[in-house]
Design a protein with these regions (language model features):
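Short, Lys/Arg-rich flexible segments
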Residues: 1-171
Length: 171
């Protein structure tokens, strides 16, 4: 004959009640996830790599020329690049203009107790992330390659799981 005794059943019920209450309001965990994803996405501008680690397409010669035109001393009198201009051109990463507007406007917003959105409010953020062709967008001066910054990397996924696990367990 098997005899089953209940020991600590109240504690189990209490822990389960706390777990259910935490699941009803995930906003603290989502806020932490949002903050971490914002930093991760901003970091992609420094590395010039997509969430999967692939490098972004380099700047076009037209972009480099326009960028160098912002600075005095980029060109010699004969029109060739000065040493300073060469250094500027070599160090220019995609999406890192003088204002750094795109990377500095990445933010998160809690939409509800179970949803967080992360991105940039800038109109051109989607074009930067997904790219576009003149065929689909006739107003473009040329095709724009995708330079994915918005997304979740493997490291981000692991971090999200850790945050959710810690939050649900009350750690």
């Amino acid at each position: 004959m098997i005899n089953i005794e209940q020991r600590g059943a109240r504690q189990v019920v209490l822990v389960l009640d706390q777990l259910v209450a935490r699941m009803d309001d995930m906003s603290p965990a989502l806020a932490e996830i949002g903050e971490d994803l914002v930093e991760s996405m901003k970091g992609r501008f420094a590395s010039a790599k997509a969430p999967d680690g692939t490098p972004w397409a380099p700047n076009s010669p037209v972009t480099i020329t326009a960028y160098l035109g912002l600075f005095k001393g980029s060109h010699k009198k004969d029109g060739s690049l000065s040493k300073k201009g060469q250094q500027r051109a070599a160090s220019k990463k995609p999406g890192t203009g003088e204002t750094k507007a795109l990377q500095t406007t990445i933010n998160y917003q809690l939409e509800s107790n179970d949803t967080v959105s992360v991105g940039s409010p800038l109109v051109y953020a989607a074009m930067f992330n997904f790219g576009g062709t003149r065929e689909k967008f006739p107003n473009l001066w040329g095709d724009i390659p995708a330079r994915e910054f918005a997304g979740v990397s493997d490291a981000d996924r692991e971090n999200i799981l850790e945050i959710v696990g810690s939050y649900l367990l009350g750690a």
